[in-house]
């Protein structure tokens, strides 16, 4: 089946197609088994063609962003992993609005907004990854959240391009709920006019804060757990005494207790075991069950 699917992918798509691709190459944690196929569609039309082919053949798939909030288990991923990296268009619109594709990096997006004097999403400068990934998890920092600036979300579902205004979205702290099979391809954002120098100063301040508080020095996925209501996950972890705790090559960062880092040679199983140890300790001490902020996928 994989040989037949590979032949059709190569014949019917224009984007890059990789076979038996180690997901450790595509995640910031640098762990994860191989995907049967790793496909980067050339554009929206290519993505539409790919989804039609996968539906026809009954092939499972998983969409990924920049891999910064993703933990892939050591058994890898069956079917097709879809990268939206080539959906990287940015278009300036009237009225302080910008359309950004899902594959645009947060850094690129923030730089464009700064240069054009458009404020409101400066906090994205310290969040690695892509606009699509930021939307999918409603990324936020410094009191801001990305979906709050969305005017219209662009998605594809069942081969149809959809446009949904923010009032029609179901979202909250670190989540944006989509229909099964619905894929984010971009969004139109409404920003505020602002002086580019003031925007740049805010960006510099956010980056300075990030460097001071999150300089961990090893591969990581950012905050591993969501903050429970009314408190911070890092504080709960720190109070258990697990800062610096290690399982195999995975370790609780000495610099930030909610960052789990790859000290070298870590496996996904190491991270999962360490996360379980943390959660058990926090629950025993406080009664709180921590919820992972990272997305955990793949086979054992």
UniProtKB/Swiss-Prot annotation:
Catalytic activity: UDP-N-acetyl-alpha-D-muramate + NADP(+) = UDP-N-acetyl-3-O-(1-carboxyvinyl)-alpha-D-glucosamine + NADPH + H(+)
UniProt signal peptide: none
E.C. number(s) listed in UniProt: 1.3.1.98
GO cellular component: cytosol
Keyword Cell membrane annotated: no
Domain (FAD-binding PCMH-type): residue spans on this chain: 30-194
Main localisation: cytoplasm
Subcellular locations according to the entry: Cytoplasm
Transmembrane segments: none
Pathway the protein acts in: Cell wall biogenesis; peptidoglycan biosynthesis
Record: active site: 174, 223 (proton donor), 293
Molecular function per GO: FAD binding; UDP-N-acetylmuramate dehydrogenase activity
Keyword presence, Zinc: no
PANTHER family documented for this protein: UDP-N-ACETYLENOLPYRUVOYLGLUCOSAMINE REDUCTASE
Family of the protein in this entry: Belongs to the MurB family.
Job description of the protein: Cell wall formation.
Entry protein name: UDP-N-acetylenolpyruvoylglucosamine reductase
């Amino acid at each position: 089946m994989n040989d037949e699917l590979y032949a059709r992918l190569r014949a019917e798509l224009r984007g890059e197609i990789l076979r038996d691709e180690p997901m450790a190459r595509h995640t910031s944690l640098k762990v994860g088994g191989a995907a049967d196929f790793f496909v980067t569609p050339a554009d929206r039309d290519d993505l539409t063609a790919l989804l039609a082919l996968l539906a026809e053949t009954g092939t499972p798939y998983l969409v990924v962003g920049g891999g910064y909030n993703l933990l892939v288990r050591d058994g890898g991923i069956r079917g097709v992993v879809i990268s939206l990296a080539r959906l990287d268009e940015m278009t300036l619109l009237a009225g302080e609005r910008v359309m950004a594709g899902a594959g645009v990096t947060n850094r690129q997006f923030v730089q464009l907004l700064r240069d054009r004097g458009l404020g409101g999403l400066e906090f994205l400068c310290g969040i690695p990854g892509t606009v699509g990934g930021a939307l999918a998890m409603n990324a936020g920092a410094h009191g801001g959240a990305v979906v709050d600036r969305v005017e219209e979300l662009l998605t594809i579902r069942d081969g149809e391009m959809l446009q949904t205004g923010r009032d029609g979205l179901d979202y909250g702290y670190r989540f944006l709920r989509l229909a099964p099979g619905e894929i984010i391809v971009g969004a139109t954002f409404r920003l505020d006019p602002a002086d580019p120098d003031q925007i740049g100063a805010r960006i510099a301040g956010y980056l300075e804060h990030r460097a001071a508080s999150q300089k961990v020095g090893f591969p990581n996925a950012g905050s591993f757990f969501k903050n429970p209501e009314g408190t911070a996950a890092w504080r709960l972890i720190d109070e258990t005494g697990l800062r610096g705790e290690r399982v195999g090559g995975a370790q609780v960062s000495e610099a930030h207790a909610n960052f789990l880092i790859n000290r070298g040679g870590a496996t996904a199983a190491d991270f999962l075991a360490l996360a379980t140890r943390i959660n058990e300790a926090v629950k025993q001490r406080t009664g709180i069950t921590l919820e992972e902020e990272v997305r955990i996928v793949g086979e054992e």
